[in-house]
């Protein structure tokens, strides 16, 4: 991450912490006050990406909200098929061995 991106990220966090709307002008003024040269495009990108979003809420829900749904949904399916899965794997392994022999590409045939 470049210094410009990092400075703009920190500026967005400062604005969110103060409850101020995140705009490109405010991001640029904060980075300018910190004596960091940031191209205006970075401020615009960050402002548009965070527009209408609650940054505090996003940060608080990173671990719990995004990861919880896939884990809960993915855990139920394998638990139901535990009894059948090993038998299927053994059958597939036997089929793979047989298919190698049938092709006749062995080095020592």
Curated annotation (Swiss-Prot):
Keywords: Cytoplasm, Phosphoprotein, Ribonucleoprotein, Ribosomal protein. Residues 69-109 are annotated as: Disordered. It is found in: Cytoplasm. Coiled coil: none annotated. InterPro entries: P1/P2_N_sf, Ribosomal_P1/P2. The keyword Cell membrane does not apply. Signal peptide: none annotated. The keyword Ribosomal protein applies. One of its GO terms (cellular component) is cytosol. Component of the large ribosomal subunit (LSU). Mature yeast ribosomes consist of a small (40S) and a large (60S) subunit. The 40S small subunit contains 1 molecule of ribosomal RNA (18S rRNA) and at least 33 different proteins. The large 60S subunit contains 3 rRNA molecules (25S, 5.8S and 5S rRNA) and at least 46 different proteins. The acidic ribosomal P-proteins form the stalk structure of the 60S subunit. They are organized as a pentameric complex in which uL10/P0 interacts with 2 heterodimers of P1 and P2 proteins. Component of the ribosome, a large ribonucleoprotein complex responsible for the synthesis of proteins in the cell. The small ribosomal subunit (SSU) binds messenger RNAs (mRNAs) and translates the encoded message by selecting cognate aminoacyl-transfer RNA (tRNA) molecules. The large subunit (LSU) contains the ribosomal catalytic site termed the peptidyl transferase center (PTC), which catalyzes the formation of peptide bonds, thereby polymerizing the amino acids delivered by tRNAs into a polypeptide chain. Belongs to the eukaryotic ribosomal protein P1/P2 family. HAMAP family: Ribosomal_L12_arch. Yeasts contain 4 individual small ribosomal A proteins (RPA) which can be classified into two couples of similar but not identical sequences. Each couple is distinctly related to one of the two A proteins present in multicellular organisms. Rpa3 and rpa4 are essential for cell survival, whereas rpa1 and rpa2 are not. This is Large ribosomal subunit protein P1A.
């Amino acid at each position: 991450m470049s210094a410009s991106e990092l400075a703009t990220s920190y500026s967005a966090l400062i604005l969110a912490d103060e409850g101020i709307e995140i705009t490109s002008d405010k991001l640029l003024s904060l980075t300018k006050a910190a004596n960091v040269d940031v191209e205006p495009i970075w401020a615009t990108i960050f402002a548009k990406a965070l527009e209408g979003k609650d940054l505090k809420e996003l940060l608080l829900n990173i671990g719990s909200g995004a990861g919880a749904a896939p884990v809960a949904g993915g855990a139920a399916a394998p638990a139901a098929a535990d009894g059948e899965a090993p038998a299927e794997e053994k059958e597939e392994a036997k089929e793979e061995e047989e298919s190698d022999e049938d092709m006749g590409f062995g080095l020592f045939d």
